[in-house]
UniProtKB/Swiss-Prot annotation:
Major localization listed first in the record, in broad terms: periplasm
Subcellular location field: Periplasm
Organism this protein belongs to: Methylotuvimicrobium buryatense
Cofactor annotation remark: Binds one lanthanum ion per subunit. Binds 1 PQQ group per subunit.
Species lineage: Bacteria, Pseudomonadati, Pseudomonadota, Gammaproteobacteria, Methylococcales
Disrupted gene: phenotype observed: Cells lacking this gene display a wild-type growth rate in the absence of lanthanum (when the MxaFI enzyme is maximally expressed) but show a marked growth defect (about a 70% decrease in growth rate) in the presence of lanthanum (a condition under which mxa expression is significantly reduced).
Other remarks on this protein: The methanotroph M.buryatense can produce 2 methanol dehydrogenases (MDH), namely, MxaFI, which is Ca(2+)-dependent, and XoxF, which is lanthanide-dependent. Lanthanides, abundant in the earth's crust, act as a regulatory switch between the two MDH enzymes, since micromolar amounts of lanthanides are sufficient to suppress MxaFI expression while increasing XoxF expression, even in the presence of excess calcium.
Protein name per the record: Lanthanide-dependent methanol dehydrogenase XoxF
Enzyme Commission code: 1.1.2.10
């Protein structure tokens, strides 16, 4: 049975390319900046994406005295994801569409410069899935890099805000958009693409930092030449060991040319290991959401990747959810940490997937070390087989096994995952990761859908609701919380502690040397907890719901903590897009989120504010 697909309310002009001779290696500059905790120079505070700060002026004893130091209104409503950069005492702030960038003087809080790109809202906004968000900026080579919603990548002079160059990264008329923060690596700017719900084939691209010229592009699926996979050198985990992927490892897992509209987009966060010269990231769900229309494992959607930063060639790749049947979009960040596992120090890559499993891999080889549920409510799979690396799917919750036009009930987690894009933090003091999580399940009904370029290519109806189970034991307890904040040991795959939250925690966390971990809540609280115990030490209600990441820096000898508030994102789409949540028929609106989060509007409204906190003088 075919059903009409309706575009949902969720969420240009290109300048001439200016040729600039020579190239510079910017990552030595970025590395130097990130080693000084007075800066917050990348989305994750460092190349490894750990979101940890050595600052400790704010600690477990005095954080209770924290108070707002100053605020800044962005002038834009809807979802504010990401967080501010602070580079050499200057703050850089971004907004959701229209993607305005502000440079702020911290002494006066005055705007040094602002830049708003020219974009066609009528073309771009209708094809933005899950709100008009933007996750932040990148700095390098004296430039601020903005990845616009309309896919244009723009380089701005960090001192003046003048455009240096811009380049088109995709075509919004085909459903392509961008929401992620780019990453500067050596003489390149790394970026990806959004649009999996429109049949966009995902890729990672590297542009020259000086000229904007394309250096390389590696697709998530397709022939080896497209994916930049070397059949004999690129490895994966199977049969209990690391081994070459072999020829046509992607196309052999698709029926016909379905891979050309196969999804696997790359709208998450990117990490980098300078010693290994590898870029790490995740690829998203296959298109369509109806698994019956795309037989096979659909490689390499739903995968973790390690690519050579110079050439884009794939070092290793690991697929977490073969033939994804639930939209468990695998784009979440990969944090790079050296840890002792079973008595041996390992260079690890740690990833908390929307599918509810926390993965620890050897980041050098791609060897699978740990794969365990970080929310025990997860039921779509019983476990991950460590030899094959494949999840063991429970047929009761298999949307393909149950069939098209059949409502598969009680699947945990819901499509927005046990964790969405909001990045984790890691404290070397405790050895724990801190996870902002969702505690939501769903009913999921796939249906046949036809592909039309630039039109939604979803093929499923879903509704979401509280998991009603204990996070640590998985036992039904009648709880109605939609979120939690969890401490996790990635060496053993065990939950250390977990705090319930009324709504999903959609804010990236921050760990500090002061023993404090910060995060924001959907109803708008900035919270501080003890890194060891999870005990709440501080809370403050900001002007709107928080889906931004908490960042910290130092200015004139004083530590500051800042976070953007502005409710939105998938969980907050009902408020952000003005969808009616007052009728039962709205349960499936916003791709299922409106019904689950209908009470959120009683706690917060639209906004767009940066709130900066500090201890009193």
């Amino acid at each position: 049975m075919k059903k009409p697909v309706k575009s949902w309310l969720i969420a240009s002009t290109v300048a001439a390319l200016l040729a600039v001779p020579a190239v510079s290696q910017a990552n030595s500059e970025v590395e130097k900046l990130t080693k000084n905790p007075a800066n917050w120079a990348t989305w994750g505070g460092n190349y490894h994406g750990t979101r940890y700060s050595e600052l400790k002026q704010i600690n477990t004893s005095n954080v209770k005295n924290l108070q707002p130091a100053w605020t800044f209104s962005t002038g834009v409503l809807r979802g504010h994801e990401g967080g501010p950069l602070v580079v050499n005492d200057v703050m850089y702030i971004h907004t959701p569409f229209p993607n305005t960038v502000y440079a702020i003087d911290q002494k006066t809080q005055a705007v040094i410069w602002e830049y708003t790109p020219q974009q066609d809202a009528d073309v771009t906004i209708p094809v933005m899935c899950c709100d008009t968000v933007n996750r932040g900026l990148a700095y390098g080579d004296g430039k601020i890099f903005l990845q616009q919603s309309d896919t244009v990548l723009t380089a701005l002079d960090a001192k003046t805000g003048k455009r240096v160059w811009s380049v088109q990264n995709g075509d919004p008329k085909l459903g392509m958009t961008n929401t992620q923060a780019p990453l500067v690596v050596k003489d390149k700017v790394i970026t990806g693409i959004s649009g999996g719900e429109f049949g966009v084939r995902g890729f990672l691209a590297a542009y020259n930092i000086r000229t904007g010229e394309l250096d390389w592009k590696g697709y998530s699926m397709g022939p080896d030449a497209d994916t930049l996979i070397n059949p004999t050198k690129t490895t994966t985990w199977k049969d209990g060991k690391v081994q070459p992927v072999g020829k046509d490892s992607s196309t052999s897992t698709w029926e016909g040319d379905q891979w050309k509209i196969g999804g696997g987009t790359t709208w998450g966060w990117y990490s980098y290991d300078p010693e290994l010269n590898l870029v790490y990231y995740g690829s998203g769900n296959p298109s369509t959401w109806n698994p019956a229309q795309r037989p096979g494992d659909n490689k390499w959607s739903m995968s973790l990747w390690a690519r050579n930063a110079d050439t884009g060639e794939v070092k290793w790749v690991y697929q977490m959810t073969p033939h994804d049947e639930w939209d468990y979009d695998g784009i979440n960040e990969v944090a790079l940490v050296d840890q002792e596992i079973k008595g041996q120090m390992r260079k690890t890559a740690v990833h908390f997937d929307r599918n509810g499993f926390g993965y620890t891999l050897d980041r050098v080889t791609g060897e699978l070390l740990v794969a365990e549920k970080f929310d025990k409510a997860v039921n779509w799979a019983s476990h991950v087989d460590m030899k094959s690396g494949r999840p063991q799917v429970v047929s009761q919750y298999s949307t393909e096994y149950n069939g098209e036009d059949v409502n598969t009930e009680g699947v945990c987690p819901a499509a927005l995952g046990s964790k969405n894009q909001q990045p984790v933090s890691y404290s070397p003091q405790t050895g724990y990761f801190y996870i902002s999580g969702n505690h939501v399940c769903m009913d999921y009904e796939p249906f046949e859908v036809e592909y039309t370029a630039g039109q939604p290519y979803v093929g499923a109806t879903l509704s979401m609701f509280p998991a009603g189970k204990d996070v640590i034991t998985g036992k039904e307890d009648g709880s109605n919380n939609l979120g939690q904040f969890t401490a996790w040991d990635a060496t053993t795959g065990k939950i250390i502690w977990s705090n319930k939250e009324q709504f999903s925690v959609w804010s990236g966390s921050l760990a500090t040397a002061g023993g404090v971990v910060f995060y924001g809540t959907l109803e708008g609280y900035l919270k501080a907890v003890d890194a060891k115990t999870g005990k709440e030490l501080y809370r403050f209600k900001t002007p709107s719901g928080i889906i931004g990441n908490v960042n910290t820096w130092e200015y004139e000898g004083k530590q500051y903590v800042g976070v953007l508030s502005g409710v939105g994102g998938w969980a907050g789409i009902g408020i952000a897009a003005g969808l009616d949540s007052g009728e039962e028929s709205s349960n499936s609106e916003g791709l299922g989120a409106v019904g689950a989060y209908r009470s959120l509007s009683s706690y917060t409204k639209l906004g767009g504010t940066l709130t900066v906190f500090a201890l009193p003088n």
